[in-house]
Amino acid sequence: MIKKYSFRKIAITTLLLLLSFLLYNYPKEINTNINDMNKKEINVIRDVNGYLSLIKIDYKSDNIDDKISLIIEDMKNNGLLPKDTSINGFALDNGLLKIDFNKDFLNMKDEDKTIEALVYSLTDLKEINKIMIYIDGNRLSELPISKKKLDLYLDRSYGINKIYDIKSINDISMVMLYFYNKDNNLVPISYFYNDNNDKLSIIFKELKSNTFIANDLTSYLNNEVELMNYELYEDRIVLEFSDKLLNMYIDGSLVEEVKYTIGYSICDTFNVNKVEFAINTKKIDELILAN
């Protein structure tokens, strides 16, 4: 009787310890998953080996004011803005951001690169289409050193990491190209050209060219891949490729680098937020960009 009672007591004690262990660890597991699900990222621009590169950083607040402040602080911390730069204030109305800095803003190391990064980063937010820069209440109409005139409104057409492949100052067009640098950061390129071909043809021609590889940039896109057809809708585009794209299709999805270089280039050029990839009219993958 004593022996049975001892075994029962040991069994109950063991069971209670096991339950305590499970209860202690279970909420921790849930919290980890919830944190991963709620993880938010925002795009900022940093100077990496001479190229303004796209970097994703975590953020906590969905408030647009907080996002703007986060972008400016990151530019200060990474040398694209002078350390003593501060925001006097800003106002956002119908997609136009008016942002007022103190005079330390003018002490930029590379003024054109700073403006490129600032315009790109801020207009990457879905709430902002264009910006106006002020210094202590006065609109910045020209760059302080080069005296380059600035448009009244600065938007994506200002360009970033600009490359000019032009033979004439007439009929200039621009597409956005995205490549990876050797640190595996996406690098946006504003490519200006005179070619009469449609923008999609230009994008895929340049993504597959060796020109940018010589500058330590690559799209990972196989030269044999051909764009067969496309359909452009209001907020998405469907791209139909030759079956050579299957060489970059692994474990049920496109190789990430290929998907992102194509997807970002298309979304930024055509102002859509979704790219669908298809072969023989069958959808094989998609990329949705949100900010």
Model-identified regions with their sequence ranges:
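Bimodal "functional hotspot" detector
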Residues: 1-291
